[in-house]
Amino acid sequence: TMSDRMFSMNKGMKVLAYDTYKNLELETATCRYVELEELLGESDVIALHCPLFSETEGIINKNNISKMKDGVIILNNSRGPLIVEKDLAEALDSGKIAAAGLDVVSIEPIRQDNPLLTAKNCIITPHISWAPKESRQRLMDIAVENLKKFLQGTPINIVNP
């Protein structure tokens, strides 16, 4: 996953993580779980790698942005509604947030009235971070393995037995 890759390439940086469900395998000398307040206040880069739940919707909002370091960079390739786009656009335009790299927005395809389209230092890609050759190959390999198991009479990942 993207988070695994980030942790393995950390090149001496200190990695802080926040999650209501901690994965203790990730907690190492280079990765430490902290409360959200500490993550917001200490991070130079905040990369969102989380699902969209009621407790994560709008987690990047005016209130939480005010707790961030000046000049922080925001990355999101998870779910668009994790970010209150108007609040992020205002923070980008004011310089509070230095830059944002987004692969997702709250409504896709992006609408022309999305405030992030005119915000300073905001790069938006069309929900394609999953599309590198390696990711597509992995999807094909999983599909082939699932089909083989099904044909052998030992299907995996059964949802409705």
What is each residue range found by the language model?
Residues K14, R32, A98-A99, N121-I123:
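Conserved beta-strand segments of alpha/beta enzyme cores
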